[in-house]
């Protein structure tokens, strides 16, 4: 069956659901999908099971990898990533967050903000997300007086992490909206959320004029066609027939793009902001991996050693309880990848939680990097610092 061509009629935006495990992120994502499919006859409704689609997730009822769905409102086309809330999987949330222009923060009204609520807010801020909308979920299970307290608490948190005091708060029950899609009262919260997204989220300015770059998130083999690399185009435009370089981790090599797709539809060209799959000529699945980038030839190079400015989280923010010293070996997260690195300090003997400091890092493998790129520093499954590259040393 021939694939349909993706029609670019509305502005495209990437959003995602973030928040603590079991606060209802996947349920809300399913409720939105079902609601939009009722408005648009071409749209496909995805149920909870379709979004939570890995066997281990079904058994545990949690989302591990970020999942993508698409839907349209009156004004926009959204790609929506459902981010995992489980602590072990925050790493995957980072790659999900790296693809979002704006986020919907889910907080269960019956339990309020929890540790991961804070960690996700911090990650959203570090990943450059400027605006969020709060969805206060499980309203049917919460005492009305408690809801008011939770609302105040969440707004304080949102402001603490640099988001606006005017952040909209939508209240409702995602489960109610998902279970009763025909009932206007149940789906009112989803309708309000989508209107709020259209009005409050600013369409991002896309770096279409810069050289092409895509951070590889996943790699698949399609029998008879070759290898597909998926990810979000960070900048530039890509068309069939263009040559690209695979950079980072291994030797840099060239290949040609033989197909561009988004949500199983063919694209005439992929552009900055699109989540795409690129079919690559003559590349074996083992030749390319998550964490590498595809780029316009000669525009980005792999490096191991750099100078960076970092902020160390305090104990209260979920960071370390004790200082770290030269020789510290955490993981550094760039775009979609984590690499172990060794820290050297200049003119300092140690770094305390809460410090802003410049460090020198040497990674154990080369990563495609450029100046000003932001990264997260993680250790033992938690974020301990965030930083930005000041200069590349080698």
Swiss-Prot record:
GO terms for cellular component: cytosol. It is an enzyme of class 3 (hydrolase). The keyword Magnesium applies. One of its GO terms (molecular function) is translation elongation factor activity. Residues 19-26 are annotated as: G1. Residues 61-65 are annotated as: G2. Residues 82-85 are annotated as: G3. Its EC number is 3.6.5.3. Residues 173-175 are annotated as: G5. It is found in: Cytoplasm. GTP binds at residues 19-26, 82-86, 137-140. It catalyses: GTP + H2O = GDP + phosphate + H(+). Mg(2+) binds at residue 26. InterPro entries: EF-Tu_GTP-bd, EF-Tu_GTPase, EFTu-like_2, EFTU_2, G_TR_CS, P-loop_NTPase, Small_GTP-bd, T_Tr_GTP-bd_dom. Keywords: Cytoplasm, Elongation factor, GTP-binding, Hydrolase, Magnesium, Metal-binding, Nucleotide-binding, Protein biosynthesis. It comes from the Bacteria. SUPFAM superfamilies: EF-Tu/eEF-1alpha/eIF2-gamma C-terminal domain, P-loop containing nucleoside triphosphate hydrolases, Translation proteins. Residues 10-205 form the tr-type G domain. GTP hydrolase that promotes the GTP-dependent binding of aminoacyl-tRNA to the A-site of ribosomes during protein biosynthesis. NCBIfam families: EF-Tu, PRK00049.1, PRK12735.1, PRK12736.1, small_GTP. Belongs to the TRAFAC class translation factor GTPase superfamily. Classic translation factor GTPase family. EF-Tu/EF-1A subfamily. Monomer. PANTHER family: ELONGATION FACTOR TU, MITOCHONDRIAL, ELONGATION FACTOR TU-RELATED. This is Elongation factor Tu. The gene is tuf.
């Amino acid at each position: 069956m021939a694939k349909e061509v993706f029609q670019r009629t509305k502005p495209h935006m990437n959003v995602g659901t973030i928040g603590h495990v079991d606060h209802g992120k996947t349920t809300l994502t399913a409720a939105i999908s079902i609601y939009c499919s009722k408005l648009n006859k071409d749209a496909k409704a995805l149920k909870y099971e379709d979004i939570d689609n890995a066997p281990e997730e079904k058994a545990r009822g949690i989302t591990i990898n970020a999942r993508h769905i698409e839907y349209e409102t009156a004004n926009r086309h959204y790609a929506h990533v459902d981010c995992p809330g489980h602590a072990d999987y925050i790493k995957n949330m980072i790659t999900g967050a790296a693809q979002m222009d704006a986020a919907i923060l889910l907080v269960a009204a019956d339990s309020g903000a929890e540790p991961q609520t804070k960690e996700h807010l911090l990650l959203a801020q570090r990943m450059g997300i400027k605006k969020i909308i709060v969805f206060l979920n499980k309203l049917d299970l919460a005492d009305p007086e408690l809801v008011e307290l939770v609302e105040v608490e969440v707004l304080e948190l949102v402001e603490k992490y640099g988001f606006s005091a005017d952040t909209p708060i939508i209240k409702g029950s995602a489960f109610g909206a998902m279970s009763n899609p025909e009932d206007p009262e149940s789906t009112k919260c989803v309708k309000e959320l989508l209107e709020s997204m259209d009005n409050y989220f600013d369409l991002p300015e896309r770096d279409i004029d810069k050289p092409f770059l895509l951070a590889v998130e996943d790699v698949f083999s399609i029998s008879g066609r070759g290898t597909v690399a998926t990810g979000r185009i960070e900048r530039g435009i890509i068309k069939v027939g263009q040559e690209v370089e695979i950079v980072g981790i291994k030797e840099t090599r060239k290949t040609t793009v033989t197909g561009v797709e988004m949500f199983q539809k063919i694209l005439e060209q992929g552009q900055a902001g699109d989540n795409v799959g690129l079919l690559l000529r003559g590349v074996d699945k083992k030749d390319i991996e998550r964490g590498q980038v595809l780029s316009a030839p000669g525009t980005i190079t792999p490096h191991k050693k750099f100078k960076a400015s970092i902020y160390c989280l305090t104990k209260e923010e979920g960071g370390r309880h004790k200082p770290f010293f030269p020789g510290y070996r955490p993981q550094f997260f760039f775009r979609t990848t984590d690499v172990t690195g060794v820290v050297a300090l200049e003119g300092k003997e140690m770094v305390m939680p809460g410090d802003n400091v410049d460090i020198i890092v040497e990674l154990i493998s080369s990563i495609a990097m450029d100046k000003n790129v932001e990264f997260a520093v993680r250790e033992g499954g938690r974020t301990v610092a965030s930083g930005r590259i000041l200069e590349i040393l080698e």
